[in-house]
């Protein structure tokens, strides 16, 4: 009986891990930008509002407002699933939500921990 119960528990835990969504890869700013530079398929995506993007952003970033669902989804239709999308926002909340959504849609994504606030705290450059 004990053996059957252990086998059943092992099988159930395996099934749960099969259906679980793989967590989004999240990197600190320095490893994040190193990965962008090393990845020939990289797309650097700033998911803040256009007004925030205009204030400052990481050089080479493309802006696509996560909070404007219609615009974001329309923009995603132009994306290529063979590329990797490196995503950031102001503090990390919007970029994580966007990264989870995009990953569920089959895109390769990497999220930057702490957003552009952490980026600037670490003295990394922005375009104004």
Question: Which residue ranges define each predicted feature?
Answer:
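Short, surface-exposed ligand- or partner-binding patches at beta-edge/loop junctions that are enriched
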Residues: 88
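Structural scaffold elements adjacent to functional motifs in cytosolic proteins
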Residues: 44-46
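Rhodanese-like catalytic fold shared by cysteine-dependent sulfurtransferases
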Residues: 2-5, 16-42, 51-84, 93-128
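Repetitive helical segments and hydrophobic/amphipathic motifs
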Residues: 11-12
């Amino acid at each position: 009986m004990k053996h059957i119960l252990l086998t059943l528990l092992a099988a159930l835990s395996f099934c749960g891990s099969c259906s679980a969504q793989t967590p989004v890869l999240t990197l600190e700013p320095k490893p994040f930008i190193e990965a962008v530079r090393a990845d020939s398929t990289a797309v650097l995506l700033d998911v803040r509002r256009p007004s925030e993007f205009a204030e400052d952003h990481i050089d080479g970033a493309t802006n696509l407002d996560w909070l404007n669902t219609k615009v974001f989804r329309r923009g995603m239709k132009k994306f290529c699933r063979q590329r990797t999308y490196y995503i950031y926002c102001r503090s990390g909340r919007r970029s994580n939500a966007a990264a989870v959504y995009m990953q569920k849609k089959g895109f390769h994504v990497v999220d930057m921990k702490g957003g552009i606030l952490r980026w600037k705290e670490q003295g990394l450059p922005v375009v104004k």
